[in-house]
Amino acid sequence: MRTLFLTLVLTANLYAQNDDYFQQGVAYAIRATLDDQRHILHARLDLTYDNNSPDTLNRMAFHCWPRAYASDNSALASQLLRQRNTDFHFAPPAARGDLDSLSFTVNGQAAEYLEDENHQDIVWLALPEPLPPGESVVITTPFRVKIPESFSRLGHVGTSYQMTQWYPKPAVYDRKGWHPMPYLDQGEFYSEFGSFEVALTLPRNYRVAATGTLKTVSEDQWLRELAITDRRRLEARQDLEDYFVTEPFPESDPERKTITYSAENVHDFAWFADKRFKVLHDTLQLAGRSEAVDVWSFFTETEAAYWMNSTAYLKRATRFYSDRVGTYPYPQVTGVQSALSAGGGMEYPMITVIGLTGSEKDLDQVLTHEVGHNWFYGILGNNERDHPWMDEGINSYYEWLYLREYYPEAEGDFDFLRRPIDLNYFGYRHLALRGRDLPPDTRSDSLVDTHYWISAYSKPVLALREIAAFTGQNALEDAIRFYYENWKFRHPGPEDLFQTLEGILSPALGRAFREAMTSRATSDWKVQDWKPGEKSSASFLQLGQRLAPATAQLLAMKAEQPATLMVNPGEEYFADDLPLSLGVELPAALNPLDLYLHNNRRGDNSLRLNLLTAPERPGGRQIFFIPLLGYNEIDRFMLGGGLHNRTLEPKRVEWALAPMYSFASNALVGFGGIRWRIREPFPFARQLMLSAGSQGFHDFSFAGENYNYTRSAVRADLTLADHPITERHRQLSLQWINLARFRPGFDPGGNLMGSIREVNSFFRLAYVQRKEREINPVAWSVRLEYKTEDVTRNSLLEASYLRLDTELRGAYQYEPERFFRWRFYGGYFLVNALRERASYPNTALSLVDNANSDYAVDGIFLGRGGGGTYAQQLETRQGGFRAPISSSFSFGRSNDYLVAVNLDATLPFQPERFPFGVYLDAGTYGFRPTSSEPSRGEFRWVGGFSVTIMDGQIGAYLPLISDPDTRLLLEQTGGLAERISFRISLTNWLPWKWIDEVF
């Protein structure tokens, strides 16, 4: 009775709050003819538009989304480049699409239209007469669609057609006005509910799958007979493939057919046509409806072994959502396997299209997700562009429930070192721990790939799992079922869902979910205390920014089942008289939005030692071991092991210790460090990283003795807050380096007497900014460096200096994966006691960036002795010359200034797998041959061929042309092989950099 009362009150409140709600009406009649020789669709639209608003309309916004494929000026083209997809950018005009031949009439009167000022795929139709409330108009126009190749959702591959968002479509008009939106690859749509009558004319041997009910009896009968025949043939075959198959297209039948479809209560119409389709059919009887649902699947030879079971998956998914959300209301459900360039699957009313999947389970999962969109998108027609989480997030939660029910053995999305990885959980934590997450209620056109996945899909799933753990699964499903029944075939917004959860579950839970969806506030529950005993007790403290529920679990003795208790939101919560247990834990599975796990367990919290790494566990007492093998010129092979605490996810405090034994030096070498990650230390900053570390290896050999160095550094990196959509990254750094080198010592007579310690300290202040665009990325940096004087050594070469370094680099992608790259560098000593001297220490500016000029040991070089093959390893700092000139020469060194330019280009006529290129380096610098001579400007240049991979991280460079002085020095290095320089940028090979840069 209480539940019924609450439901009635909530229903009354919801309707009272939405008494100004209205919804426009649309009825489409479309006739279209496919020309599959020219990939053109000729069509006519007759649209009846009902103005149910209280406003008089003078104009209407229409989406002409195929126009997004017409040029590089569309929002689609820009977004594809942000997604690092250049296929459309480099596509020839013949491969692109368009929508033209519009000629609008309104109630028989000609009507003018204008293209939107900002978007070529939106037009504004001026109504000849105002459309008052409660009235209707009939709008007609011919239109022609030039079908693009498959770059996103609409397109064709050969004569396989994916016809989606293909017709002129009015934008939604609601309480907030018109909602025109450009077509996007990532970011879906918002459309009016209505009816469709669509007649398609095309060659007779096409098999068509579409939204709605097929009204052409002969075509329907043909497909049903075909489904019986195809199933028999497929069941008899032993050669069905489970991978991509290149399947030829049959010739089109010269005879044409016209087939008609109708659909009610839908807001879109999609169709797919392919002469190669195999067809399967089944029916599904559901509780709550008298007529069976027709279940269809259309697929090619590609992954046919998996698609043999597709109708069973479709039936199971449709029943699952019907039981848990609401009975499926449409007459049919269809799955199509076809070309798809926008994600793994895409939903439309009653029909979904799926690309390659890779396994039966993955096919089942993707089909289930897309079928689920019939409820969360098809029936609940929220604004997907403004609030993508409302359909993707909630639907992904039900997909997660489906997988738990039908694949209980699959604990995660994949296994890493035999440990299950939940990608929703892992992905959210990886972004949030580094301050890179965004609120789920962010417009989809403001999200880049990873953020779209985490914000629209992952975090809403975790927030709903958090609520279900607290209230129980049934209570949450009841609330969503109520929301569904209240808003089906309408346009709910976030507030409607929040109010439902607040009313059905509790105000606190509703507010917690609201905050999780609309903010970046984090939750952090801590097990403050736990006291063992026959009646143990525990206290919990809320440290996070977000008011959130938590669910704790007792660690039971032996075979006893763990007991679960609920922890309400608040500053602190005490629990007394708990059953006997080994401890208490806030499990990650029950508290998936709790960001910091190190404080989530008390009691049984033993230290664990694992190999390599693992996901973080509550309590955080984990140490990992990594076997290490190293090599350098002096130490030769080094064997050791690394201990660290870095889990797959970033941690607040991370440390590593990696001792190794050098067999050549008979000594311990290695490195170690610690860093502290502070999330959002200031309103303008995303992250502050404080780090300290030390390393020690041998880098010099003399008279049979190896001499070592020790480099210690402390650093602070402040990453500024830039929205990911800007593609801009800014970082401010402060660093102190102390470098101690041991070198042979000599008495006044020149006799070797032990070793001496050379110490240098450097202070650096730097700013770096990058614009990571796909076609023309650019980055610049400025660094101020102060070197302290080594007072223990009486040498002018150890004097202090103040130096300014600037760098500007960029690239232009002129063909797919073929770049022209450029770099400018300028260095100047603001203060330098050696400016008037002809002595050039390794701290001097240098055209060649080799081990000798790496004076602060910033890079990783295989050898630092300066000779042999090791001297051919170069980097691209300072002058960046790709010429292995010996550091024993004063070539390219300056105590005053240095300016250089580095150019290289990938050759346009080469195969992609062999990235040959050409390069040219040039520079000028201030040089004194002797201290008594005035400084003069020297100009040097060198050019040649290159082979590079991994975006230039690995490369080989052969100098072929140069100025005379440079040529002479190159000839002195030896033959052709000795003149080749190579680059192996080892600092970018650390595994954590790979993982962190993915997210």
Can you say where each PLM-predicted feature lies in the sequence?
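Outer-membrane beta-barrel initiation region
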Residues: 561-563, 567-569, 576-578, 586-686, ...
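Hydrophobic helix-coil surface modules that form long, contiguous segments used
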Residues: 173-174, 178, 187-368, 397
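Beta-strand-rich binding/interaction modules
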Residues: 209-210, 272, 509-510, 523-587
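Hydrophobic alpha-helical and helix-loop surface patches within well-folded domains
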Residues: 16, 25-26, 48, 261, ...
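N-terminal, polar/Ser/Thr-rich
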Residues: 15-42, 157, 510-515, 613-617, ...
